[in-house]
């Protein structure tokens, strides 16, 4: 069974508080989302395997540790997920980046996929899907479906805020996938927004309405 983990590090919670504020401007919102993602990847990558590597220091030869095995692919769900990519790449600069494009029907709240672009050999890669919000869970579930259909076997989902309804739906659909969030919020309102949430992350990241 995949785990659901809230990352409650003080720095993450501090920056999350900043972006919850409706008066947080686009520039600061974008910067904090990037920084939160960078802080979160420390925990998300905790179980990545290491291998011994021989290096020569200025003093002598030494056996050191480096990431081994599967190559990482960061997969933002367009468009809001893009805001989390650079923070992860700061710590895993060799990661590849795939993209999944989805939009949500404002009446039914159901997601619709319109674009998927991935590297080859997903079965040999560690996939990290990123999206600031886990609301109904529909987009996240569909994103995992798309990756599994293309052969991915090792998948993690990372978000900033999650609603209990979305977590429940996601875990029922994909019990093998770990979920990491900076917060578990209270509930979804009738418009499908997370409460208290942080509004429309895509609009706030890109200065649109």
From Swiss-Prot:
Disulfide bonds: none
Record: residues binding uracil: 194, 199-201
Cofactor note: Binds 1 Mg(2+) ion per subunit. The magnesium is bound as Mg-PRPP.
Database matches in InterPro entries: PRibTrfase_dom (IPR000836), PRTase-like (IPR029057), Upp_B (IPR034332), UPRTase/APRTase (IPR050054), Ura_phspho_trans (IPR005765)
Substrates-to-products reaction catalysed: UMP + diphosphate = 5-phospho-alpha-D-ribose 1-diphosphate + uracil
Molecular function in Gene Ontology: GTP binding; magnesium ion binding; uracil phosphoribosyltransferase activity
Classification via NCBIfam families: PRK00129.1 (NF001097), upp (TIGR01091)
Function: Catalyzes the conversion of uracil and 5-phospho-alpha-D-ribose 1-diphosphate (PRPP) to UMP and diphosphate.
Family (UniProt): Belongs to the UPRTase family.
HAMAP family per record: Upp_B (MF_01218_B)
Protein name listed in UniProt: Uracil phosphoribosyltransferase
């Amino acid at each position: 069974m995949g785990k659901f983990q809230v990352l409650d590090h003080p720095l993450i919670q501090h920056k999350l508080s900043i972006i919850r504020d409706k008066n947080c401007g686009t520039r600061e919102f974008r910067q904090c989302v990037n920084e939160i993602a960078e802080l979160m990847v420390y925990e998300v990558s905790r179980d990545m395997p290491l291998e011994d590597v021989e290096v020569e220091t200025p003093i002598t030869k030494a056996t050191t540790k480096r990431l081994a095995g599967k190559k990482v692919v960061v997969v933002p769900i367009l468009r809001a997920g893009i805001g989390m990519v650079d923070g992860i790449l700061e710590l895993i600069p060799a990661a590849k980046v795939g993209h999944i494009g989805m939009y949500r029907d404002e009446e039914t709240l159901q997601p619709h996929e319109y674009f998927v672009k991935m590297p080859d050999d997903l079965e040999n890669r560690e996939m990290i899907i990123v999206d600031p919000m886990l609301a109904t869970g529909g987009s996240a579930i569909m994103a995992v479906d798309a990756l599994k259909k293309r052969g991915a076997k090792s998948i993690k989902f990372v978000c900033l805020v999650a609603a209990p309804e979305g977590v429940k739906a996601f875990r029922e659909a994909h019990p093998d996938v770990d979920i990491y969030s900076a917060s578990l919020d209270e509930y979804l309102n009738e418009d499908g927004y997370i409460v208290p949430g942080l509004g429309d992350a895509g609009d706030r990241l890109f200065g649109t309405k």
